[in-house]
Amino acid sequence: MEKVCVLGAGSWGSALAMVLAENGHDTLVWTHRAEQAEEINRMHTNKKYLPETVLPTNLHATSDIAKAATHAETIVVAVPTKAIREVCEKLTAELTKKVLFVHVSKGIEPDSLKRISEILAESLPAEKVDEIVVLSGPSHAEEVVLHHPTTVTAACADIDAAEKVQDLFMNQFFRVYTNDDVIGVEIGGALKNVIALAAGITDGLNYGDNAKAALITRGLAEITRLGVKMGGNPFTFSGLTGMGDLIVTCTSVHSRNWRAGNMLGQGMKLQEVLDQMGMVVEGVRTTKAAYQLAEKYGVAMPISTELYSVLFNDVEPKVAVDALMMRMKKREIDEMKH
């Protein structure tokens, strides 16, 4: 039995905490909202994020980050990308021993263009970090809590650390593979949210299955181009954390990014969409980072670029789609390389 703390009591943090508790681990969830911690402890529910779910009675919560830090041998970071530095700052003062960190956030920090593992390595004291492992893949929280079969990947340059995380989470409903390609896994997990926003827009415009199939395929091509240029393994992008996560995020009603894109395609403005969603839509922030990364690495990312225009330059979605369709003629395989 491992002592594990999950930082973040949103839908994904709560679902993973449920997996860990059901696997017999001593699991504590940290939330910055005291009333949410009390609800989890007293009612064994998290109505805002998982309204139909009863949480295990051996899963506990706290709003005291000092208690969270001292409890854990392994810490799972399940907070939005924009909150990671702030949470790490609070956590750093309370860490008393070396800890294995697992992050499950999918994003890239705009401007700094750092991946999550880089932000963690920069924000946490090195002497208190055992290893940093990323856990990613096609995994909607709403299905995990129903024990629907789910398969993900644990990635770390230190494969022993990845295998430890594999052992922590794996059970008959939740299968975990390992990978040593942290860059590829993180880039695939982050950028699929960008393509999912675009997929939602095509559905909002009622453009049908042909358009969405093309968008997913061409989206994978540009994710792969960038990921390989940044040092990722090209084979990673055809795996669970690339194509797998892209499919589920572009096609499922559980996907926040798809839902947000769908509203944009129906004519809503970005701020209206974000206000109505009431939850973090990582793809919006990541689109800005993707646009910056494309410029930095000199990689063609036409879908991400047009989406950036829709989100931040008030270009109409239909105009952006027309621009993609009328790009210069290309050979498909050559275009996937460059």
Curated annotation (Swiss-Prot):
Indicate which residues the UniProt annotation says bind NADPH: S11, W12, H32, R33, K106, A141, R256, V280, E282
Residues binding sn-glycerol 3-phosphate, per UniProt: K106, G137, S139, K192, D245, S255, R256, N257
Q: Where is this protein localized, as stated in its record?
A: Cytoplasm
**Which pathway is this protein engaged in?**
Membrane lipid metabolism; glycerophospholipid metabolism
Q: Which UniProt keywords apply?
A: Cytoplasm, Lipid biosynthesis, Lipid metabolism, NAD, NADP, Nucleotide-binding, Oxidoreductase, Phospholipid biosynthesis, Phospholipid metabolism
What residues make up the catalytic site?
Answer: K192
The source's superkingdom equals Bacteria
Q: Which EC numbers does the record give?
A: 1.1.1.94
**Gene Ontology terms: cellular component:** cytosol
Record field: catalytic activity: sn-glycerol 3-phosphate + NAD(+) = dihydroxyacetone phosphate + NADH + H(+); sn-glycerol 3-phosphate + NADP(+) = dihydroxyacetone phosphate + NADPH + H(+)
Region forming the signal peptide = none
Xref: InterPro entries: 6-PGluconate_DH-like_C_sf, 6PGD_dom2, G3P_DH_NAD-dep, G3P_DH_NAD-dep_C, G3P_DH_NAD-dep_N, NAD(P)-bd_dom_sf
Query: What Pfam families does this protein map onto?
Result: NAD_Gly3P_dh_C, NAD_Gly3P_dh_N
Task: Output the Gene Ontology terms for molecular function.
Answer: glycerol-3-phosphate dehydrogenase [NAD(P)+] activity; NAD binding
Example of a GO biological process term = carbohydrate metabolic process
Q: Which family does it belong to?
A: Belongs to the NAD-dependent glycerol-3-phosphate dehydrogenase family.
Job of this protein: Catalyzes the reduction of the glycolytic intermediate dihydroxyacetone phosphate (DHAP) to sn-glycerol 3-phosphate (G3P), the key precursor for phospholipid synthesis.
Write the protein's name: Glycerol-3-phosphate dehydrogenase [NAD(P)+]
